[in-house]
């Protein structure tokens, strides 16, 4: 995975994918995915607008032997994607760094170690977090093909969209930034 996180010109690391209406895959219908990595070798991202109601962050840290504290109460657990759904990934602001942290850009990072969970529980964690179970992954050229097939739109990501916009509003906010009303979109498009 480290090779995927190197900077590559012409790729969409640090952007958001926005699912086109009628994309045909219920796992991704209506989703916004923050791309943590996108290179010729593949892509990896975290769905940022699908909360999991059946599990809480205090439950997760408790199961891992970390004492839940009031700092855990505001962290929501999200479906990060269909790959490795039993594994946790924390997308967060870059104010927190440790040995296992992978910087995506100057403002956001990804950590998938117990250290970040301990830091969150102790109040020493990142300012903003998304705790995700699983991730969205694409093999070499797969995402590029989906982009050419009009499965996804792309929008530059920022802290407001990723962390501060309400989960239920992220899709319409991302579409709105593109000047698009999703109700008026068709999944069919022509190419010249």
Swiss-Prot record:
SUPFAM superfamilies attached to this UniProt entry: VC0467-like
Organism: Rhodospirillum rubrum (strain ATCC 11170 / ATH 1.1.1 / DSM 467 / LMG 4362 / NCIMB 8255 / S1)
Any one of the GO CC terms: cytosol
InterPro entries for this protein: AlgH-like (IPR003774)
NCBIfam families, alphabetized: PRK00228.1-4
Recorded family membership: Belongs to the UPF0301 (AlgH) family.
Database matches in Pfam families: DUF179
Protein name: UPF0301 protein Rru_A3059
């Amino acid at each position: 995975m480290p090779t995927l996180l190197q900077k590559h010109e012409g790729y969409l690391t640090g952007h958001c994918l926005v699912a086109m209406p009628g994309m045909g895959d219920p796992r991704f219908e209506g989703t916004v995915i923050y791309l943590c990595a996108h290179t010729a070798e593949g892509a990896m991202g975290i769905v940022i607008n699908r909360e999991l109601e059946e599990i809480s962050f205090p439950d997760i840290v408790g199961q891992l032997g970390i004492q839940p504290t009031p700092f855990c109460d505001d962290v929501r657990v999200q479906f990060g994607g269909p790959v490795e759904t039993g594994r946790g990934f924390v997308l967060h602001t870059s104010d927190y760094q440790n040995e296992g942290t992978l910087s995506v850009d100057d403002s956001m990072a990804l950590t998938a170690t117990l250290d970040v969970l301990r830091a969150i529980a102790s109040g020493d964690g990142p300012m903003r977090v998304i705790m995700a179970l699983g991730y969205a992954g694409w093999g070499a050229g797969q995402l590029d093909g989906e982009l050419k097939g009009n499965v996804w739109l792309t929008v530059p990501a920022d802290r407001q969209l990723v962390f501060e916009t309400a989960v239920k509003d992220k899709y319409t906010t991302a579409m709105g930034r593109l000047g698009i009303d999703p109700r008026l979109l068709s999944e069919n498009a022509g190419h010249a």
